[in-house]
């Protein structure tokens, strides 16, 4: 496991990292990494869509029994079973649901690392065409010399251009940054 400032090194600290590492090792032993990933992705999507589920996960008001009952109902409705479901239940029983989103991120980082995939965050001012997105992915693959998983984010405040972050490196070629640089240069020239 990389601990040298790479994405997984920074993601795997604390409780989230310990839980994610334990889950990853168990999933790998049971040859269930893809199934666990799918279950966690499904739960993460539900979490992002449901304000009620977010409250359940974040609120200290609910007892662990209440959380486990509610989580059981959510898992059953979503069809999440096996190791992923047991992990989510364990998080609820141990009153760690509030850390679950970080655990899921850390697990994803371990999966990417095990498959030799690099995570890249790409921010653009507007949604790119499929062709442009493929060009960006191809360029990132060439630079990283690895398969790249692109997390695309739309940020209209960039005005134009692109901001790319891979690991601890970031390249900001946005129009907003260029305009700010010009503004500073002109102010200093006075």
Curated annotation (Swiss-Prot):
Alphabetical list of Gene3D superfamilies matching this protein: N-terminal domain of the delta subunit of the F1F0-ATP synthase
UniProt-listed SUPFAM superfamilies: N-terminal domain of the delta subunit of the F1F0-ATP synthase
Keywords: ATP synthesis, Cell inner membrane, Cell membrane, CF(1), Hydrogen ion transport, Ion transport, Membrane, Transport
Bilayer disposition of the protein: Peripheral membrane protein
GO (cellular component) term, any one: proton-transporting ATP synthase complex
Pfam families (UniProt xref): OSCP
Localisation: Cell inner membrane
UniProt-listed InterPro entries: ATP_synth_OSCP/delta_N_sf (IPR026015), ATPase_OSCP/d_CS (IPR020781), ATPase_OSCP/dsu (IPR000711)
One function term, GO molecular function aspect: proton-transporting ATP synthase activity, rotational mechanism
PROSITE patterns with a match to the protein in the record: ATPASE_DELTA
Primary role: F(1)F(0) ATP synthase produces ATP from ADP in the presence of a proton or sodium gradient. F-type ATPases consist of two structural domains, F(1) containing the extramembraneous catalytic core and F(0) containing the membrane proton channel, linked together by a central stalk and a peripheral stalk. During catalysis, ATP synthesis in the catalytic domain of F(1) is coupled via a rotary mechanism of the central stalk subunits to proton translocation.
Assigned protein family: Belongs to the ATPase delta chain family.
Subunit organization: F-type ATPases have 2 components, F(1) - the catalytic core - and F(0) - the membrane proton channel. F(1) has five subunits: alpha(3), beta(3), gamma(1), delta(1), epsilon(1). F(0) has three main subunits: a(1), b(2) and c(10-14). The alpha and beta chains form an alternating ring which encloses part of the gamma chain. F(1) is attached to F(0) by a central stalk formed by the gamma and epsilon chains, while a peripheral stalk is formed by the delta and b chains.
Full protein name: ATP synthase subunit delta
Primary gene name: atpH
